[in-house]
């Protein structure tokens, strides 16, 4: 019995002197992903998890800290280290929610100033809305719009007349990804009264630019031709792209088609010469290889191709549609400066626009609909789409 008691005492001592401090320091290290750009060696998806679910992960340092308090008498030094690390981890894990609350207070006024006021009743961000929300799936049809290319069509769930249509262009570095990427947003948009077309396009390296532009233009032409049977308004289209899809969205959406009422680009590059200049072979994506595959070589050898793929070079006063840009400040895969430079060019040309920059966020910031990034993104989309697709009076 005495031996067992001694073993138990040593186990408890190890818990308070080694295990709890280790857990606390690990939690602190993970929490820092809400404040610093993820090193290339760290999977960026981990940063998405920590940033958008920090309010849940905060239970870990909270539990560890409370447990450590009970052992202060036996291991005061280790307990203080544990408590300090837990306190810092809590701050960083809850930082996204605090920053989202502050941004949410300002966002409605910023959206109204950029695109005009619209009746949006729900708050941009609410702590009560944090949680796991999976949009209920609605009907979806698959159609071939060109040989070998299909789109998924989500009919608008409400509304009496032809619906405005959001054309969703997937990301994936131009050489991967598909139209089924993050479908929850498509179902949510359909429930808001918009038709949604999630389109496929040919991928590099087998199909370099401008194949992707041709495919999206073909999809737009098909949607317009079949607007009557689909129940959409061919004169009210919005392009929405993520990452590489955002690059395609601006490069196509800025060609001057009056039916394109707006463009939404999430964490995307828009000036391919600039993208080449800041890329390295050892970055998280091996961006130089991706761009060689996509654009056929370096900019000095493919000047016209680089220019036609750069929405920033296509901005024109009076014809470029209103644009919503959303980007995470600490995005490792696509530098936030891409969106900042695009916003500056749009401002210079007098194009209505807004850059929503999320300080804690990285790539795929809207993947968790109930998280800080998801709430702010859907609010911004709700306002933007209502403003730019309003029927002409």
Regions of interest found by a model, annotated:
Residues 68, 218-280:
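Primarily recognizes the serine-hydrolase "nucleophile elbow" in alpha/beta-hydrolase
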Residues 177-186, 197-236, 255, 368-377:
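Catalytic nucleophile-loop/oxyanion-hole region of alpha/beta-hydrolase
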Residues 318-319, 325-327, 331:
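Short beta-strand/loop motif that positions the catalytic acidic residue
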């Amino acid at each position: 019995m005495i031996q067992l008691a001694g073993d138990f005492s040593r186990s408890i001592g190890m818990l308070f002197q080694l295990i709890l401090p280790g857990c606390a320091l690990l939690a602190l290290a993970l929490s820092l992903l809400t404040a610093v750009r993820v090193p290339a060696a760290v999977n960026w998806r981990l940063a998405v998890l920590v940033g958008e679910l920090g309010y849940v992960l905060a239970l870990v340092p909270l539990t560890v800290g409370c447990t450590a308090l009970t052992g202060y008498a036996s291991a005061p030094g280790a307990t203080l280290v544990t408590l300090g690390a837990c306190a810092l981890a809590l701050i960083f894990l809850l930082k996204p929610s605090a920053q989202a609350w502050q941004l949410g207070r300002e966002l409605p006024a910023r959206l109204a100033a950029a695109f005009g006021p619209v009746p949006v009743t729900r708050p941009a961000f609410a702590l009560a809305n944090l949680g796991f929300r999976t949009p209920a799936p609605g009907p979806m049809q698959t159609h071939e719009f060109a040989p070998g290319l299909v789109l998924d069509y989500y009919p608008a769930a409400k509304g009496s007349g032809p619906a405005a249509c959001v054309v969703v262009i997937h990301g994936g570095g131009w050489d991967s990804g598909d139209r089924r990427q993050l479908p929850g947003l498509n179902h949510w948009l359909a429930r808001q009264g918009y038709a949604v077309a999630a389109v496929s396009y040919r991928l590099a390296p087998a199909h370099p630019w401008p194949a992707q532009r041709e495919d999206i233009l073909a999809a737009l032409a098909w949607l317009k031709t079949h607007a009557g049977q689909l129940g959409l308004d061919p004169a009210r289209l919005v392009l929405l792209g993520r990452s590489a899809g955002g690059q395609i969205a601006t490069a196509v959406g800025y060609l001057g088609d009056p039916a394109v009422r707006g463009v939404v680009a999430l964490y995307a590059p828009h000036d391919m010469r600039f993208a080449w200049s800041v890329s390295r072979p050892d970055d998280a994506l091996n961006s130089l290889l991706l761009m060689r595959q996509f654009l056929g070589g370096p900019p000095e050898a493919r000047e016209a191709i680089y220019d036609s793929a750069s929405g920033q070079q296509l901005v024109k006063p009076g014809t470029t549609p209103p644009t919503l840009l959303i980007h995470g400040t600490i995005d490792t895969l696509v530098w936030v400066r891409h969106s900042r430079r695009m916003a500056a060019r749009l401002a210079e040309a007098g194009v209505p626009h807004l850059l929503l920059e999320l300080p804690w966020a990285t790539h795929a910031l809207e993947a968790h609909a109930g998280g800080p990034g998801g709430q702010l993104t859907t609010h911004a989309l709700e306002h933007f789409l209502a403003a730019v697709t309003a029927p002409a009076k």
